């Protein structure tokens, strides 16, 4: 099973790429974390926000594996603790489908992507820069996985 972080935005600071990769490489071969960064639609075109998000939606959909579970990261999503995320991860693993975690661009995700999600999760009550989101999500997933296997990385 793969965990696919599909995020709008390609250029992030080097520290964010390094931190993300540090967590991604810790996952076992049967539970890989993979990043698919899709291009942000240029905000200088004068197009309405809905058109910009629709263009990004098309790119996100092209990156989605067939039959995957879609999990939207959204400010209105459900709050989860590390233990709850570990439980979700175990459910996802039993299900066997790849899991796509979707992170929108500067204006968020197109409404049809949000409506079509299997799950909606909230990473934080704060508005976070995209670089932080990638790193925090990778760390949270790694922490959840270590909790589920009894690894000492996570401590209560």
From Swiss-Prot:
Instruction: Tell me the SUPFAM superfamilies matching this sequence.
Output: alpha/beta knot
Protein's recorded name: Ribosomal RNA large subunit methyltransferase H
Q: Which gene encodes it?
A: rlmH
**Which keywords appear in this protein's UniProt record, sorted alphabetically?**
Cytoplasm, Methyltransferase, rRNA processing, S-adenosyl-L-methionine, Transferase
* Reactions catalysed according to its record: pseudouridine(1915) in 23S rRNA + S-adenosyl-L-methionine = N(3)-methylpseudouridine(1915) in 23S rRNA + S-adenosyl-L-homocysteine + H(+)
Protein's organism: Leptothrix cholodnii (strain ATCC 51168 / LMG 8142 / SP-6)
EC annotation? Answer: 2.1.1.177
| GO molecular function terms noted in the UniProt entry | rRNA (pseudouridine-N3-)-methyltransferase activity
Q: Which amino acid positions bind S-adenosyl-L-methionine, per UniProt?
A: 73, 104, 123-128
- Any one of the GO CC terms: cytoplasm
The entry describes its oligomerization and partners as: Homodimer.
Family in the record: Belongs to the RNA methyltransferase RlmH family.
The family database entries (PANTHER family) matched by this protein are listed as: METHYLTRANSFERASE, RIBOSOMAL RNA LARGE SUBUNIT METHYLTRANSFERASE H
NCBIfam families recorded: PRK00103.1-4 (NF000986)
Task: Kindly give the Pfam families that the UniProt entry links to this protein.
Answer: SPOUT_MTase
Record's subcellular location: Cytoplasm
């Amino acid at each position: 099973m793969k965990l696919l972080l599909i995020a709008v935005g390609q250029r992030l600071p080097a520290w964010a790429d390094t931190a993300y990769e540090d967590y991604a490489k810790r996952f076992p071969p049967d539970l890989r974390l993979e990043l698919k960064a899709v291009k942000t639609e240029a905000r200088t075109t004068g197009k309405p926000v809905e058109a910009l998000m629709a263009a990004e939606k098309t790119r996100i959909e092209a990156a989605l594996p067939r039959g995957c579970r879609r999990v939207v990261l959204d400010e209105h999503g459900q709050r989860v603790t590390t233990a709850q995320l570990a439980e979700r991860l175990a459910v996802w693993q039993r299900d066997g489908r790849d899991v796509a975690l979707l992170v929108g661009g500067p204006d968020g995700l197109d409404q049809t992507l949000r409506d079509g999600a299997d799950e909606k999760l909230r990473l934080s009550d704060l508005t976070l820069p995209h670089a932080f989101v990638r790193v925090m999500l990778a760390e949270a997933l790694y922490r959840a996985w270590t909790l589920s296997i009894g690894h000492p990385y996570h401590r209560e």
